[in-house]
Each structure stands twice: as C-alpha cells, then as structure tokens.
Amino acid sequence: NNLHLKEILPVLSKSAGNAHILFFQNMWIDDLDSINKYLSEKQYFFGFPFMVGGGRDAGCIYSAISGLKQSHTPLGEPNGEISERVRKIADAFEDANLKPIIYNQIKIWLITHYAVAAGLSAGIMKAKSGRNFASNSDILKEAIKAIREGLEVCQKLGYNPKAVKANGLYFLPFFIAIPIAKKVYGNEALCLMFDGHTQHSPDEMKKMFEDIITDGEKHGVKVYILKQIKEGIFN
C-alpha cells in the first residue's frame, strides 16, 4: 500500500534500470509528488485493483473478484498517452478476465477514488463490517457526506470528480443515492473486499483520512464529517 512508497522509491530509483514499473495501489497527491522525485514518467505508469481484494484470518486466506457490471481494472499513463506498455498489460488483464479500461486521465481516477475509498472506509469501520454498512441507511448517508467532502477537496486541488462517471452516484439526492448504494455495496464479493481492506490496513485508512483532512483544511474545505468519523474510530 502507499505507506511503503517512502521505503521503496529510493530502491527503485537506483535499481529499476529499464524496467516498466506499474504502481497498482491507492494514490494521493503527495504520493504522486514523491514518485516524481525519484522516477521519470517514462519509467512508470498506474493502475488499480478495483475489482479484486481479500484478507485473512487465523486459518484462512480468502480472495474475492467482483462480478459487478461497473467493476474493472483501471490503467493509464501519467501523461494520458495510450502507450504500448499500457496496451500490453491491458491485454494480460483481459486474458485474466479482469476487464481493463485504459484511462487518459488516470490521475483523476486515482485521486478521486482515494477520496471515495476514504469515505466508504469510514462508514465500513463505523458499521464494523461491509454487510452492516450496506444495510444501514444512516451510516450510508454519513459516508456519502464524507465522500462529498473528499471530492470537494479533490476539486480544490484541480482534480474534477465529475470527470469520472462513477462519482456521479455521490452527487445524487440521498433518496436516490442510498437505495443504489445499498444494492451496489451489498454485493457479497464487495463486502469481502471491504472487510479485508479495512480490517487489515487500519494504518493506511488512518493516513487516507489524514491526507484528505490536511489538504482540505489547507484549501478552506470544511471536512467536519471526515474529522468526526476519524476521531471516533482512532481516538
């Protein structure tokens, strides 16, 4: 996850050679800046495991692949080019039935997804599980409010959330958004993915909240809901 970038980037800078590096993880603005300090754009590109996830308990490692229509694997170059290397990795994902989509604005997808994931994670952690989250209208409403705060921060930073079609859900009136969210997030595979991520990466969740809150306050965005949920979970 993005907690390890500071450790791995100096190593990659010295040893990557002519390798093409695929960063396949959550990304916020400071992560993009850190990568640029160590690598040139010709050395790397981006993706995200949007339709796969999992976790483990004492006796089992489990994985999940979402079969939802909107699930896919985003890929893209930092500069938006549809390059040969992106096409090659897209072909590999296609062979694995992971539905790759090449974006010409992958940074916008990643940054706004970070905000969405933070808001969803806040709700899931408050509800104690993905299944509880998907069935609780009040927590879903609060999570959507948190997502809206995060997406407003993205907008202030120059990443237009409405450029990503999927973000439209979070701008709908609650009486429309909440029933849709219940149907989407009640998917069994998604619940497993949610639980795996939130239960096994609390430090990453905390960093996500802090990143958005810090940049929100810096740019005059009110992030009351995110702050309130973060304090309730981690204090």
Q: What role is predicted for each listed range?
A:
Residues 14, 38-43, 60-161:
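Internal alpha-helical scaffold of NAD(P)-dependent oxidoreductase catalytic cores
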Residues 13-20, 71, 215-218:
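Short, surface-exposed connector motifs at secondary-structure boundaries
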Residues 54-58, 110-115, 173-175, 235:
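Short, solvent-exposed polar/charged micro-motifs at secondary-structure junctions
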Residues 144, 148-235:
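NAD(P)-dependent Rossmann-like dehydrogenase/reductase catalytic/cofactor-binding core
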Residues 1-61:
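Rossmann-like NAD(P)(H) cofactor-binding subdomain of soluble oxidoreductases
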Residues 28, 48-54, 79, 106-108, ...:
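Glycine-rich beta-alpha junction loops
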Residues 3-4, 26-27, 81, 85, ...:
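Soluble or luminal CAZymes and related metallo-dependent hydrolases
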